[in-house]
Amino acid sequence: MMPQSLPDTTTPKRRFRWPTGMPQLVALLLVLLVDSLVAPHFWQVVLQDGRLFGSPIDILNRAAPVALLAIGMTLVIATGGIDLSVGAVMAIAGATTAAMTVAGFSLPIVLLSALGTGILAGLWNGILVAILKIQPFVATLILMVAGRGVAQLITAGQIVTFNSPDLSWFGSGSLLFLPTPVIIAVLTLILFWLLTRKTALGMFIEAVGINIRAAKNAGVNTRIIVMLTYVLSGLCAAIAGIIVAADIRGADANNAGLWLELDAILAVVIGGGSLMGGRFNLLLSVVGALIIQGMNTGILLSGFPPEMNQVVKAVVVLCVLIVQSQRFISLIKGVRSRDKT
């Protein structure tokens, strides 16, 4: 009788996978570590006049507008689109805020009007993309160019300044020992997370980004979903515009939100979002915004000219896009398979 061989009971080795968000958190810690090496007192935080001050707090404060833009941009990119107009929408909202404040309107009317401009801008983009089927890049590029002109028309081509302590609180005040913009960004993140993860909206957005035709066949109103993402992106841009205008107590239509649309896109990409659409993570997009602001702060603290920011961001975008490319992924998979053999 031939001896029977015992069955192989060894379990296959599991491949190690980073926990969700770990690469982004490690990158953020590395950026902050480099900043601390450049500035010896980087981690020093003091409490003064009921508010925390220090470089880490300043990073949180300065990252708030980009984080707000990134929250809205995340939803748009998740549908496979892009919104290049968020910087211009910031300028429009800021110009509306300053002009109406100078005209003597009450604070609630000013805020509602500024938020309304963002919603209308997002609705305009949504109609062009979802209804008229214009490519998102081209559709939002129209408002990106025209929006600056609209903001200049609102301010009559002038830098409008105002003196309203109540409005200024939204840009330079404090709440719970933290700058007001940080609190606003956190509350917006929580609200959008609840909206997308505790309702079916998030699933619909991801379905549209993964396969819009399949989502439509499944009964999803893809036009409404796409339009809604652009409306929410415009709303986030308007909130950021109010914060910036309140911080400087004025509106500069030429420079408000200039090139911040690129920072918002970069924040989403750093957060793991794919420009092809699909799954998204709002929290990691905010972490991406913190990484960008951390790099900006490090460059300024190290004494390099501010123009270096754009070069560094371009290199980061290139590296992230290469890592996300199908060719690079296939190459890595091929190397792993050869190592196993």
Swiss-Prot record:
Location(s) in or outside the cell: Cell inner membrane
Residues in coiled coil: none
Keywords for the protein's UniProt record, in alphabetical order: Cell inner membrane, Cell membrane, Membrane, Sugar transport, Transmembrane, Transmembrane helix, Transport
Residue ranges that the UniProt entry lists as topological domain Cytoplasmic: 1-25, 130-136, 196-223, 277-281, 324-341
InterPro entries (UniProt xref): ABC_transp_permease (IPR001851), YtfT (IPR053777)
Recorded GO MF terms: transmembrane transporter activity
Biological role: Part of the ABC transporter complex YtfQRT-YjfF involved in galactofuranose transport. Probably responsible for the translocation of the substrate across the membrane.
Protein family per UniProt: Belongs to the binding-protein-dependent transport system permease family. AraH/RbsC subfamily.
Name assigned to this protein: Galactofuranose transporter permease protein YtfT
Lineage of the organism: Bacteria, Pseudomonadati, Pseudomonadota, Gammaproteobacteria, Enterobacterales
Name of encoding gene: ytfT
